[in-house]
Amino acid sequence: MTLQEEIIKELGVKPIIDPKEEIRVSVDFLKDYLKKYPFIKSFVLGISGGQDSSLAGRLAQIAIEEMRQETADASYKFVAVRLPFGVQADEEDAQRALAFIKPDVSLAVNIKAAVEGQVAALNEAGVEVSDFNKGNIKARQRMITQYAVAGQYQGAVLGTDHAAENITGFFTKFGDGGADLLPLFRLNKRQGKALLAELGADPAIYEKVPTADLEEGKPGLADEIALGVTYNDIDDYTEGKVISDDAKAKIEAWWNKTQHKRHLPISIFDDFWK
């Protein structure tokens, strides 16, 4: 088995999907979790305005609505959380996403004070924080906030990790990489777009240039520039297609370099890192 085949197997990506079928798979997955753990009464998700959180958010809202209808339990809620750092340049995109998702509850928590406070405390201790590391603090602060909200709403936190992101490790460890459920796992970027189109999303949501937008020195830096490879190549790779040697080498290098992000903390019984 080639490394490409091993990765595809681990990520569970299909070369061809039926968007309607995959929507149902994700919705049922979320509902099954609520049925298994009846004390969980909500799903919580941070909404950025991009493709991934828009899709995960809409799937969660559908699952919650179906649970309310099937159980007659009105306490089930989906909580969408806006988590801007100061003034978000693409706030219009975030509002467009919320209009599409139609969440039961919509909150806005500005993380700037918390992040700047952490950076100031580190500086006071003699630790200089780089722009890159500050970006990771932002991602982790957003997850701290989501878990605080989930604690108040008897909720589980959703993540937006998907195959095209997971394969490159393009997420912050214990930041956006930390969640309870991943309804998009197994889908690559173009497949996520297909699901959004099926759900009737405004094309502006899934045609938006993907960006983590964590570094202040590189505002709005496109994912593809940061990674050095296109999502089209990543999607082709995860679907088992032949891509250029250069793109393949970059993707597999990211996979190997970020392997630690796909595991729980390493114990003496783990050998994947050796």
Curated annotation (Swiss-Prot):
UniProt: Mg(2+) binding residues: 52, 165
Single Gene Ontology BP annotation: NAD biosynthetic process
Question: What residues does ATP bind to?
Answer: 46-53, 160, 189, 211
Q: Which reaction is the catalytic activity of this chain? A: deamido-NAD(+) + NH4(+) + ATP = AMP + diphosphate + NAD(+) + H(+)
| Binding of deamido-NAD(+), residues | 140, 173, 180, 260-261
Pfam families recorded for this chain?
A: NAD_synthase
Q: Which GO terms describe its molecular function?
A: ATP binding; glutaminase activity; metal ion binding; NAD+ synthase (glutamine-hydrolyzing) activity; NAD+ synthase activity
Q: In which pathway does it act?
A: Cofactor biosynthesis; NAD(+) biosynthesis; NAD(+) from deamido-NAD(+) (ammonia route): step 1/1
Q: What is its EC number?
A: 6.3.1.5
**Taxonomically, which superkingdom?**
Bacteria
Keywords, A to Z, come to: ATP-binding, Ligase, Magnesium, Metal-binding, NAD, Nucleotide-binding
* GO CC terms of this entry: cytoplasm
* Role according to the record: Catalyzes the ATP-dependent amidation of deamido-NAD to form NAD. Uses ammonia as a nitrogen source.
Q: Which family does it belong to?
A: Belongs to the NAD synthetase family.
The UniProt subunit note reads as follows: Homodimer.
Q: What is this protein called?
A: NH(3)-dependent NAD(+) synthetase
Q: Which organism is it from?
A: Lactococcus lactis subsp. cremoris (strain MG1363)
Corresponding gene?
nadE
